[in-house]
Amino acid sequence: MNTLLTFVSINSENMKKKKNIAIVAHDNRKKDIIEWVNFNWQELIHHDLICTGTTGKMVEEALIEKCRENDEVPPTVTRLKSGPLGGDQQLGALIVEGSVDILIFFWDPMQPQPHDVDVKALLRITVLYNIPTASNRSTADFIVSSSLFHEKYDPILKDYTSYMKRDVDMN
């Protein structure tokens, strides 16, 4: 029996100067993420933003208000489904496709989530694809204030070719 296998390689695209930034927050952290967005709005408006559910609506509204007050053009905000409704998995798929450069995810460490397994899978994918990830304000501030944030960047990715080509014992 012949089996055709297609090996999918890890996307090795460079991060361009204009980044694709995913912004996600659990309900108890939405206030924190909006405070962070308001603090960093002048950086964020130069990038494309991807958000899950309600967070996306709140981020978009905050940036529209800041841009209106300062005569700036708001950024593109792509809104996915809410996390528990599949938004975290949509975001993970975008990472695998090479469409996300940075993840800012303020998750709630004190509250179990109905979609904890999806959150864990999303965080695993960020490690697998070497995506800079911030889970708190300090780390998020360090990411957007880094000189690398304002430049093209070539992330170093682990080569998983041997894993994809491994023999699996079917006995």
State the predicted function of each range.
Residues 46-59:
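Short internal beta-strands
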Residues 31-44:
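Histidine-anchored nucleotide/phosphate-binding helix
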Residues 3-11:
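Short, positively charged and aromatic/hydrophobic N-terminal segments
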Residues 50-52, 79-81, 105, 133-137:
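General beta-strand structural signal in soluble alpha/beta enzymes
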Residues 85-124:
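Mid-chain, well-packed structural core segment of small domains
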Residues 138-170:
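Short, glycine-/small-residue-rich phosphate/pyrophosphate-handling segment
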Residues 119-150:
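Ser/Thr/Gly-rich flexible loops in soluble cytosolic domains mediating phosphotransfer, phosphorylation
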